[in-house]
Amino acid sequence: AFMALMNRVFQPYLDRFVIVFIDDILVYSRSVEDHAEHLRITLQTLREKQLYAKLSKCEFWIDQVVFLGHVISKKGIEVDPKKIETVLQWQAPTNVPEIRSFLGLAGYYRRFVEGFSIMAGPLTKLLRKGVSFHWDDHCQQAFEELKRRLTSAPVLTLPSGRGGFVVYSDASYQGLGCVLMQHGKVVAYASRQLRPHESSYPVHDLELAAVVFALKIWRHYLYGETFQIFTD
């Protein structure tokens, strides 16, 4: 209810210079001048709606912020170091609920890891109905590789304006993968495992499935844009 209220209050400014999550308000701008105006509008809106922010919990004019498990700065977006520390300390799962917990945390940052779903395959297989839990060398290797990739995750660029998007997609009988780039910098990675019926597809159909997957998952960036897409 409170989240819905905040979204209504800031609806004219959402995704323009304001992001709201429950009672957290993030104001972002491209220049100092813009930021001064955006802050004025945000604070004035709160005042008009008789909503009050506690000064001790506010931070103003910062060039880096931790928000929803990410560090956002002018360099781009990266994984919160505190979350990386949690990943490093994670012990190998000994049952299905522990696998779910690990994949829940790791999956939250899947956009930072190229081929995440394919890499996690040995772990997700243990989540299937009727499959007995057996942690073998393939599972351990996948677990360690996911931890390594997450703890060395790259800084992803934040999309800037319109145009310049390029999509690279690929497919194999292990899964589908794609990369979204803008002006030569990585915006996000995406991947998924094959669905049961797709395992019988010829390779060229899988390549097309990867293209469709990329266009669907990044449609909010690509809709109405002219862009390039490369596939095998």
Where are these regions (language model features)?
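Active-site palm subdomain of RNA-directed nucleic acid polymerases
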Residues: A1-A36, F116, K216-F227
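Short beta-strand scaffold segments in enzyme catalytic cores
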Residues: L176-L180
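Short, flexible loop/turn motifs enriched in small residues
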Residues: A171-Q174, Y223
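RNase H catalytic domain
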Residues: M181, S191, V212-D232
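C-terminal reverse transcriptase regions that engage the nucleic-acid substrate
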Residues: L5-R8, L14-R16, F21, I41, ...
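Two-metal-ion RNase H-like nuclease active-site motif
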Residues: G164-A171
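A short, polar/acidic, helix/strand-boundary loop motif
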Residues: A1, Q182-A209
